[in-house]
C-alpha cells in the first residue's frame, strides 16, 4: 500500500481546524451555569445550528470510505442510506415525534419513556443506550483511526486517537451540548468543503456527468445497474424491498425518532418551531451527502483504470485485479474500501488533501462529541439520578447534576 504524504500546508490546515475546535469549546464554557445549560444548551439552540449538528453527527469518517466503496462495487443505490434511509424519516420525525418530545420538556428519550410507562422501562432503555453508545464510541475511534491513519498515512493511529479524544473530550466536558453544536457547525462546513472538493475533482477528471455515465455504460452489462437507485429484489446487497421497507420504513423512522444522539439537539431548541425546522433542515442538508460520498466511488470506475493503465506503478500490483468488461480488460481495485484513499492520494493536491483529512476528522469528532454528550445526559438523568430517587435519596440539584455530567464525560 502506498501512503498519502501530507505537505506542510496540509498539516497546517488540520492543526488550525483542531485548535479552532478547542477554542470554541473553551469559549462556550462561560455560558454553562447549570445542568440545563450543560445538557440542553439552556434550550437556546437556533434551527440552523440544530440542522447542521444533526447532519454532521450522523456522518462518520467511515461513511466516506464505505459508501464510496459500495458505490464503486454496486452503484448509486449505495446512496440510499442517506436518501431513503434518512430524509423521509427526518420529515416524519419533525412533524410527529420532535414537537411532542420538545413540549414534554424531557432531557432524554428514556426520561420520556419513564414518564409514559415507569421507572423500570426508563432504566432498561437508558442502560441499553449507554452500552450501545460506549461500544460504538470505542469502535468509531479505533476503526476510523486505523483506516485513516495507519492505512492511508502509514502512521501509528494511537497518536491520532489520543489527540482527537482529548480535544473532543475537552470541549464536550467544558461546554456540553452548546459546545458540541457550535463545533458541529464549523465541522459541517469543513466536511462539506473537503467532500465537495473531492467530488468536483473526480467529475473533472472523468469529463463530467455525461462522460461518467457513458464510460460506465460502455463497460457492459455487469455495470448496467450502477445508475439505478432501486436495484432488483433479488440483488444480494441492496434489494429494493429491503431498502424501501426495511431501511426506509422501519429502521430509519426508529433511528431518527428514537436515537438520543439525533433527537438530543432538538430537545435543546429555543422554540418548538426551531426544533421542527432544525430536523427538516438536517434532512435537506443530508440530501447532499451522497453526492460527496457515493459519486467519487462511481468516478473511480473510470478514473482509476485510466491512471493505472497509463502508469501501473501508481497502485501496487497486489491491490489490483484485471476484470474483463465490454470495454476491454480493466485494472480494478480488489478492495472497495481502498477507493477513496487511493483517489485522495492520486487526485488531490497539497492543501486540498489537508481539507479532505480535516473533513474526515470533523465527521469523526462530531460523532464522538455527540455520543459523549448524549451518554452523559442519559447517565445522569436516567440512571444515576433516577436510581438515587428510587432508593430514597434526594434528586440531584442543578450544580450536582452539572458536576456529575462533566465527571461522566471525563470518565
Q: Which residue stretches match the model-derived regions?
A:
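Membrane-interface "cap" regions at the ends of multi-pass membrane proteins
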Residues: 1-64, 172-175
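Loop-to-helix junctions at membrane interfaces in multi-pass transport proteins
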Residues: 2-7, 40-45, 49, 66-81, ...
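Residue-level recognition of pore/gate-forming positions within transmembrane alpha-helices
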Residues: 18-21, 57-58, 86-90, 130, ...
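Juxtamembrane interface elements at the cytosolic ends of transmembrane helices
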Residues: 19-35, 96-110, 170, 174-176, ...
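Helix-loop-helix module between adjacent transmembrane segments
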Residues: 21, 56, 77-175, 247-255, ...
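Short amphipathic alpha-helical coupling elements at transmembrane boundaries
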Residues: 37-40, 111-118, 126, 147, ...
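Loop-to-transmembrane helix boundary motifs in multi-pass membrane proteins
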Residues: 116-123, 134, 380-411
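Membrane-embedded translocation segments of transport machinery
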Residues: 333-365, 386-405
Amino acid at each position: 500500500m502506498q501512503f498519502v504524504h501530507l505537505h506542510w500546508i496540509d498539516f497546517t490546515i488540520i492543526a488550525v481546524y483542531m485548535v479552532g475546535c478547542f477554542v470554541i469549546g473553551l469559549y462556550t464554557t462561560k455560558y454553562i451555569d447549570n445542568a440545563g445549560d450543560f445538557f440542553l444548551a439552556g434550550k437556546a439552540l437556533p434551527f440552523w445550528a440544530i440542522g447542521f449538528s444533526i447532519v454532521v453527527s450522523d456522518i462518520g469518517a467511515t461513511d466516506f470510505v464505505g459508501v464510496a466503496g459500495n458505490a464503486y462495487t454496486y452503484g448509486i443505490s449505495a446512496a440510499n442510506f442517506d436518501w431513503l434511509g434518512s430524509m423521509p424519516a427526518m420529515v416524519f420525525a419533525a412533524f410527529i415525534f420532535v414537537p411532542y418530545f420538545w413540549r414534554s420538556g424531557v432531557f432524554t428519550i428514556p426520561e420520556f419513556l419513564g414518564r409514559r410507562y415507569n421507572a423500570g422501562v426508563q432504566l432498561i432503555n437508558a442502560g441499553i443506550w449507554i452500552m450501545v453508545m460506549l461500544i460504538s464510541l470505542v469502535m468509531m475511534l479505533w476503526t476510523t483511526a486505523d483506516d485513516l491513519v495507519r492505512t492511508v498515512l502509514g502512521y501509528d493511529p494511537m497518536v491520532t486517537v489520543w489527540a482527537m479524544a482529548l480535544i473532543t473530550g475537552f470541549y464536550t466536558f467544558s461546554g456540553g451540548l452548546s459546545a458540541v453544536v457550535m463545533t458541529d457547525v464549523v465541522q459541517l462546513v469543513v466536511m462539506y468543503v473537503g467532500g465537495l472538493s473531492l467530488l468536483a475533482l473526480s467529475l473533472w477528471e472523468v469529463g463530467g456527468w455525461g462522460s461518467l455515465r457513458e464510460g460506465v455504460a460502455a463497460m457492459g452489462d455487469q455495470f448496467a445497474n450502477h445508475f439505478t437507485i432501486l436495484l432488483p429484489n433479488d440483488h444480494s446487497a441492496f434489494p429494493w424491498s429491503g431498502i424501501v421497507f426495511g431501511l426506509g420504513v422501519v429502521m430509519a423512522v426508529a433511528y431518527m425518532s428514537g436515537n438520543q444522539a439525533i433527537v438530543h439537539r432538538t430537545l435543546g431548541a429555543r422554540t418548538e418551531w426551531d426544533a421542527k425546522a432544525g430536523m427538516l433542515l438536517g434532512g435537506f442538508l443530508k440530501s447532499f451527502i451522497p453526492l460527496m460520498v457515493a459519486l467519487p466511488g462511481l468516478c473511480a470506475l473510470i478514473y482509476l483504470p485510466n491512471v493505472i493503465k497509463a502508469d501501473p506503478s501508481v497502485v501496487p500490483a497486489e491491490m489490483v485485479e484485471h476484470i474483463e468488461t465490454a470495454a476491454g480488460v480493466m485494472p480494478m481495485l480488489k478492495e472497495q474500501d481502498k477507493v477513496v484513499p487511493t483517489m485522495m492520494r492520486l487526485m488531490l493536491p497539497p492543501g486540498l488533501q489537508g481539507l479532505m483529512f480535516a473533513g474526515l476528522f470533523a465527521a469523526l469528532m462530531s460523532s464522538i462529541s455527540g455520543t459523549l454528550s448524549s451518554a452523559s445526559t442519559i447517565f445522569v438523568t436516567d440512571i444515576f439520578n433516577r436510581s438515587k430517587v428510587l432508593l430514597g435519596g434526594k434528586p440531584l440539584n442543578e450544580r450536582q447534576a452539572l458536576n456529575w455530567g462533566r465527571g461522566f464525560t471525563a470518565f
